[in-house]
Amino acid sequence: MASKTVARSGNRTSSLKATSRGVSQSRRPVPPRPRRNRPAERRNQSLLLAAGLTCGQAIRATWLVAAKGAGGAARSIGRARDIEPGHRRDGIALALLGLAVVVAASSWFDAARPIGAWVDAVLRTFIGSAVVVLPLVIAAVAVVLMRTQPNLDTRPRLILGATLIALSFLGLRHLWSGSPETPEVRRGAAGFLGFAIGGPLSDGLTAWIAAPLLFIGALFGLLLLTGTTVREVPEVLRGMFDTGLFQRDYDDQYDAEYRYDDIPGAPPEDFSGCYDGSLVGGGDAEQKVRGWPVTDLAEVSLQDDVPTTPEPAVQAGTAEVHRLTPRSAEEHRTQALDRAIEGSYTLPSMSLLLTGDPPKKCSAANNHMASAIGGVLTQFKVDAAVTGCTRGPTVTRYEVELGPGVKVEKITALQKNIAYAVATESVRMLAPIPGKSAVGIEVPNTDREAVRLADVLTAPSTRRDHHSLVIGLGKDIEGNFISANLAKMPHLLVAGSTGSGKSSFVNSMLVSLLTRSTPEEVRMILIDPKMVELTPYEGIPHLITPIITQPKKAAAALVWLVEEMEQRYQDMQASRVRHIDVFNEKVRSGEITAPLGSQRVYRPYPYILAIVDELADLMMTAPRDVEDAIVRITQKARAAGIHLVLATQRPSVDVVTGLIKTNVPSRLAFATSSLTDSRVILDQAGAEKLIGMGDGLFLPMGASKPVRLQGAFITDEEIHAVVTACKDQAEPEYTEGVTTAKTTGERTDVDPDIGDDMDVFLQAVELVVSSQFGSTSMLQRKLRVGFAKAGRLMDLMETRSIVGPSEGSKAREVLVKADELAATLALIRGGASADGSNED
């Protein structure tokens, strides 16, 4: 009844609702859901579950906060800017060593309880009996971290290779133990990891097939770890046994000492301190022995190659260039020049010169540069890789080998991108490197080293060459010392902007000559228009005349040098010899004597070296006379023993003319300000990319490509010591008439372009003499004439000895005093009237 009553009431209610809504269709009544009362026990369980979930969430949140805080603190410590990457790497290695000690104590000696017992139990659960070798593996990884440089490119390959070897070893250990099933037995075999690797293979393929598969996996991991391909394995094994690699002990014996071996064909030095990851490499020969390919940047050990033969750029028959290996500082001071000196003159001791530090090896900065270059090649999808590195004192040359079908232009077109990647502008490319199938990319070193002149002069090959005109140049990019013979150049053109190292080279050249030659062997003419560069050498016994500072006297000295050359050629022609060396030998032996009735006494001719510190000043003053004299000397003076060294900081076409370039075959270019200057001095680009401070390109006679070198440096104290040693032994014997201008007997009168206006010329003379100021601009202002006419007026006054020669932008020296003005004007008028009588 109750249910029916409820149903009726429900129907009544629904019908009322339908009527009120205006709905004619009746609906089925919805029975109400009965309320069910849950038992008390189930309600308590729900409350407990909710509380547990809440506690779990709270614990999880607390754990995440703690973990993030600890991780952030650890990362902040690891990324601290004041901790260098090398120190962080050492910290990880030391932590691994500590872990190896704990694992060894717990697994070998059952010590370090209670933590040791827990560590041993956990490790045996996962890797089983392999826990015995785990401390050795951890210690080996720590040693590798401490002794190698980090390399992000090789890290994935090394990790994958080591993982494959470890898993394959555990799987084989599981199979060797009979594939145990129970956890207790697996703890004595290969643990859970061995069971997870070897179990499915043995169940699905049987142990006879699973074992070879695991062995192949371990072999592939070994190939990844060493960076070797399968086809290279026979060559690697053959090279190991052929060279006795297993019987030799490669160590860092050259860290503190550097051997000097000038024997042709001697092996290069082994700089084994520049490693990437776990890779080891020495020279090219050692790379072939160990068989690691050089197709990937990460698999290359960047090294200091020390070749034993010159580059093909310096060929036989060209200017003699010696390449030498470094020497220790102790040997410099104990050796003397290996040749006999006639007479009482003694050459200055090499102990007066300072020696340099041992050469630096490649560093982490070089690895970073190589990685940056490789990254640029990868970004632009160029099939090429950095395969080698040669560190010099100033720059490092990275060798890039191209893939099949890749044009060299693709590399050279990326020069600016590479410069951007390595954060420098002075990137020079050498395509290709002489004697190698590779493109060279030369990048400046961040830690450049100084090259001392003493190191170059005391090198074995320099000492074995007893010629008195051998000079020390510096050290090339491969770390070899370079010296050259001026007699074989036979003339040298040096150019470079301010601060490029040109003056340092001139000083090194002069000190080289002073320490290797006597005044009877070499005489010098020093022309210094700057008046300060060559002043320290004033009074040395090798000088023919005092140091020349006036351009007019310099031109006269060059003319005298031409006459001296002609005189020597006449003597050689009369003696039927072709070179001054042969003439001197015959004079010493008595084969050449003066004819009967002649009072002349034949003596050996010394070499004459004329050094012009600034050619531009001479070409501005007397271009025609200077150029004619230089061209005649450079064309003919080689056999006469006369040599020129022309230096300028403005190698423009009006200074270094075509005739001068044609007859001066050897060039030395330091940093220039523009590409045009580089092409003027070298006939090719390159000098504009040099970084200054002695960085130069040496192009000897007969070479097609220049050699990059760091010029030798010498201090003012060393120069003073050597010059003093020379002055104390002899006084200079000057030759008369060297700087005296030759008079032709002709007289230059008033220029016809002036219009024979004597009044203008007389006014100009009166202005200059009365003011004692010989300036062309003053004549322009006072006389209101043009620049050309004022210049001709000044030249006319110079021909009449009223003013001195031009000194560039300075005012000319007035030679006539103010009280002599009247007599000078009368003399000019008298000469003009005499000339004017012939007119009409």
Curated annotation (Swiss-Prot):
GO terms for molecular function: ATP binding; DNA binding. Residues 1-42 are annotated as: Disordered. SMART domains: Ftsk_gamma. It comes from the Bacteria. It is found in: Cell membrane. GO terms for biological process: cell division; chromosome segregation. Residues 479-679 form the FtsK domain. ATP binds at G499, S500, G501, K502, S503, S504. The chain crosses the membrane at residues 92-112, 126-146, 158-178, 205-225. One of its GO terms (cellular component) is plasma membrane. Consists of an N-terminal domain, which is sufficient for the localization to the septal ring and is required for cell division, followed by a linker domain, and a C-terminal domain, which forms the translocation motor involved in chromosome segregation. The C-terminal domain can be further subdivided into alpha, beta and gamma subdomains. The alpha and beta subdomains form the DNA pump, and the gamma subdomain is a regulatory subdomain. Essential cell division protein that coordinates cell division and chromosome segregation. The N-terminus is involved in assembly of the cell-division machinery. The C-terminus functions as a DNA motor that moves dsDNA in an ATP-dependent manner towards the dif recombination site, which is located within the replication terminus region. Required for activation of the Xer recombinase, allowing activation of chromosome unlinking by recombination. Belongs to the FtsK/SpoIIIE/SftA family. Homohexamer. Forms a ring that surrounds DNA. This is DNA translocase FtsK.
